[in-house]
Curated annotation (Swiss-Prot):
GO terms for molecular function: metal ion binding. This is DNA mimic protein DMP12. Acts as a DNA mimic. Interacts with the DNA-binding protein HU and partially prevents the binding of HU protein to DNA by occupying the DNA binding sites on the protein. However, the relatively weak affinity of DMP12 for HU suggests that it may not completely block the HU protein-DNA binding, and that DMP12 is more likely to act as a regulator than a competitive inhibitor. It protects HU protein from limited digestion by trypsin in a limited trypsin digestion assay, suggesting that it may serve to protect the HU protein and improve the stability of unbound HU protein. The shape and electrostatic surface of the DMP12 monomer are similar to those of the straight portion of the bent HU-bound DNA and complementary to those of HU protein dimer.
């Protein structure tokens, strides 16, 4: 697995794509977008071991145990709860988590779905 090919993202406000694979393609083509967070396999494992994904799982009922576990699509109803949970966690000051929170805030403001593509 490529060390830098895992993403947490939402589409930009001016982008309307309904096909899931096209959303993934868009994210890879727009990796520098403010709405795309690139995350390594090692980071996924580290945060799993530290309990970050458990916080998200408690809200979404989608359980992630490590890389290649599949994809999460976080619906609009859960995004606010996930954002608040992360902001109130011990992880909230870490740069990667700050970037994830930014994507969640953007998604809330622009009514977008957030995708965890692991």
């Amino acid at each position: 697995m490529n060390e830098h090919n895992l993403l947490i993202f939402c589409l930009k406000d001016n982008v309307s794509i309904s096909e899931y694979t096209e959303m993934i393609d868009w994210a890879y083509k727009n990796i520098q977008s403010e709405t795309v967070v690139e995350i390594t396999e090692n980071q996924i494992i580290e945060y799993q071991n530290r309990g970050l994904w458990r916080l998200v799982s408690e809200i979404t009922d989608n359980w992630l145990f490590g890389p290649s576990e599949g994809d999460w699509l976080i619906d609009k109803e859960s995004i606010l709860a996930v954002k608040e949970k992360l902001q109130n966690s011990d992880f909230s000051t870490e740069p990667l988590v700050k970037n994830i929170i930014h994507v969640l805030e953007y998604a809330i403001k622009n009514e977008k779905t957030v995708i965890f593509h692991f």
